[in-house]
Structures are given as structure tokens and as C-alpha cells.
Amino acid sequence: MITTTSPTIEGKQIIEYKKIVFGEVITGINVLKDIGAGIRNFFGGRSGGYEEELIQAREAAIEEMENRAEALGANAIIAVDVDYEVLGADNGMLMVSVSGTAVVVE
């Protein structure tokens, strides 16, 4: 499955547009990671725990979107957009949503 943020794929011709496809993941943020991130934030470092959580959530959302495109008979997704949102009363949830246009290319 070709997945790109571009509206076209160089060297490929789009022969059919299927529909817009989405992938969403909502994950809780671990309390221990919060404590570690707070300490690193205080001292000016990066939070590896949060970064790993973000990477995993993004990859899962993209995989979900690709599975939905494949179910439509698409072999590529163009114009992919990735959005992040912090949710919950205490900002304890992370939502990653991705969208793109499922297409068939030669």
C-alpha cells in the first residue's frame, strides 16, 4: 500500500478514486510517564515515553486507515493528513486521527 501526503504519486497514474478513508486511535497516557515527563520538562529534556506512545498511536492509526482502503480495493492512499489532539478532563488521553483518499493506481 502506497501512502503519501502528496495529492499524486510520481510515476503512477490514478485510475480510480474510491473514497475518503480514516484511521483513529485514542490512547491513555500512563501516570508513570507523566511523572518522568514532568521531571524531564523541568530539566529541559525530551520525554522518550511520550514520544514512543505518540509513534505507536500514529502507526496504529495509519495501519487502520490502510486496512480500510484495502477493504475498498484501493492500492494507495493520497493526500494523507495526520492530526493530534489531547482529550479528557485532565488531558490524560491522546487521539491521533489520519485521513486520506483511497485510490487505485497503475
UniProtKB/Swiss-Prot annotation:
Gene3D superfamilies in alphabetical order: Hypothetical protein apc22750. Chain B
SUPFAM superfamilies documented for this protein: YbjQ-like
Family: Belongs to the UPF0145 family.
HAMAP family according to UniProt: UPF0145 (MF_00338)
Protein name per UniProt: UPF0145 protein
Species in which this protein is naturally found: Listeria grayi
UniProt lineage: Bacteria, Bacillati, Bacillota, Bacilli, Bacillales
